Amino acid sequence: MQASLAKCARGVASRLPCLLLLIAAAMPALSQSAAKPPAQTAGANPPAHVSQTLIDSSIPDDSAVDAMVAGYAPRVRELENVIGRVKGGDLRKGGIGAGTLGNFVTDGILFEARQKLGNSVVLAVTNAGGLRKSVIAEGALLQRDIFELLPFENALVEFQLTGAQVLDLLKQVVSHRDAQAGALITYLNDAHNRPQLQSARLLVDGKQVEIDRDATYKVICIDYLWKRTAVAVSDTEGNYSILNHAQKIEPLDLTIRDAIINYVKRETAAGRDIKPNADDRFVSAAAAGGTQ
């Protein structure tokens, strides 16, 4: 067994992050929700034993370990596939809306949701904290990059919300600097330098549309924002409990990661590169001439 592990270490050392990503992705319970620490028994302090074993060619292989490693090898190699190209600068996370990286992800969610549900989908939202890679550099875009960016098994879900609920949703998006695609937002920083929603319109077929508080809109979010139990406003987590009051809640049977991989592949097949999209979906009212 030790020899098999040694051979595994030598053979996949350079691809170990990819292997760990695949193992993590294979765990159905993995999500952004924090795991509870194991219960501690009072006074329990078992003794520790340390030993050293030299792993070299003198130790025979273990067929079970060899078979396990061989099963992952094709998927590890698949992560090195180039699925697209980033051109025009790096994709970076930062600031309100999670920067151009947040725009890239929510643009992809909105595009893929419309492939499934049609153009009636008007808005896509995800949290900035779920984007676990700060930069995707200009150049070749690997499948591994998307796994590193989106390591969680978060599923996309359709929510049918009233216009009033959409505005409440966007208040949380703005105040916690989360990412969205489909809305044009004006915000203003409060005394604590926290951005607050001032106004919002939807961008439908290239035209700005006022949000009708009584109308019904299709919105796509990740299930994490819907299912998590912590709803108190904090510096890192917004209160998305409004999603529980949707008129309709319907899973898309698609994870956020698969949606973005599909999106990149579609863009590549159409001859388009992924470009940093620093558009005006978030505009400061102060910068636009308002007062603070």
Language-model regions: role of each:
Residues Q32-Q292:
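Catalytic centers of hydrolytic enzymes
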Residues Q2, P28-S31:
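Position-driven detector of the extreme protein N-terminus
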